[in-house]
C-alpha cells in the first residue's frame, strides 16, 4: 500500500491534491488492494519470461495420446507457462500456442514433419472437460519424462496481506497499480503517465 502511495505522491504536481481530507485512508487502501491483483496479472502476463520467477512447478504425471503426443493437467491457479521440457527434447519451450491458431492446427497434420518434434517442440494450453491441460508435441516415444515444468500462478493476496510478485516485475506492478487507482479518482493524465512508466520496467 505504502509503495503505491509513494509512487503517486512522487509523480503528482504541486497543484494535484489527490487524497484530500475527505478521502478516507481506509478507502484509499481498499482501492489499492482491489487494483493490485489486476496490475500484477497484467504485468506478469505481458513481461518477457526472463523477468519472471519460476518457483511454481507443474505436476510431472504425463498422459500419453499416441505418436509421442501427451499432456499434463494444469493446476487451477495456472496463469502462464515459464518453461517446459521433456527428457528427449533438444530445447525448452517457453511460450505456448493458442487453440485456434494455425500452428495448433498443424499439430493434427498427418505428416510428422509438420508437427512439433524433439528438435522443435510445441506446447499449447487447452481447455478440456477435466480442466486446463498443457498439450505437448512431441516425443520420440512414451519413455520420455518431464525434466522441467514451471509456471506463474494467478496473483492473489494471502492472509497476511502479501502478494507474490516476481522481483523484476515489482516496480512495474507498483506503478500500474497507482495508475489504476488514479483512474478511479478521475486523474486520467497522471494515470496514463504512470501506466507508461510501468511499461518501461518490463518492455525491455
List PLM regions with ranges.
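Glycine-enriched, solvent-exposed interface loops adjoining structured elements
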Residues: 1-204
Amino acid at each position: 500500500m505504502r509503495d503505491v502511495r509513494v509512487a503517486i505522491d512522487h509523480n503528482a504536481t504541486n497543484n494535484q491534491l489527490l487524497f484530500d481530507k475527505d478521502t478516507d485512508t481506509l478507502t484509499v487502501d481498499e482501492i489499492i488492494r482491489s487494483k493490485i491483483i489486476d496490475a500484477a496479472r497484467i504485468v506478469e502476463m505481458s513481461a518477457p519470461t526472463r523477468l519472471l520467477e519460476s518457483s511454481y512447478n507443474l505436476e510431472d504425471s504425463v498422459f500419453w495420446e499416441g505418436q509421442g503426443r501427451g499432456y499434463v493437467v494444469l493446476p487451477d491457479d495456472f496463469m502462464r507457462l515459464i518453461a517446459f521440457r521433456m527428457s528427449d527434447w533438444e530445447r525448452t519451450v517457453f511460450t505456448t500456442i493458442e487453440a485456434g491458431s494455425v500452428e495448433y492446427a498443424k499439430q493434427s497434420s498427418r505428416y510428422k514433419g509438420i508437427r512439433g518434434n524433439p528438435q522443435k517442440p510445441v506446447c499449447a494450453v487447452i481447455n478440456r472437460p477435466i480442466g486446463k491441460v498443457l498439450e505437448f508435441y512431441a516425443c520420440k516415444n512414451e519413455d520420455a519424462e518431464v525434466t522441467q515444468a514451471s509456471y506463474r500462478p494467478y496473483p492473489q493476496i494471502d492472509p497476511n496481506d502479501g502478494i507474490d510478485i516476481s522481483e523484476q516485475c515489482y516496480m512495474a506492478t507498483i506503478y500500474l497499480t497507482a495508475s489504476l487507482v488514479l483512474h478511479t479518482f478521475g486523474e486520467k493524465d497522471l494515470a496514463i503517465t504512470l501506466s507508461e512508466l510501468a511499461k518501461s520496467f518490463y518492455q525491455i
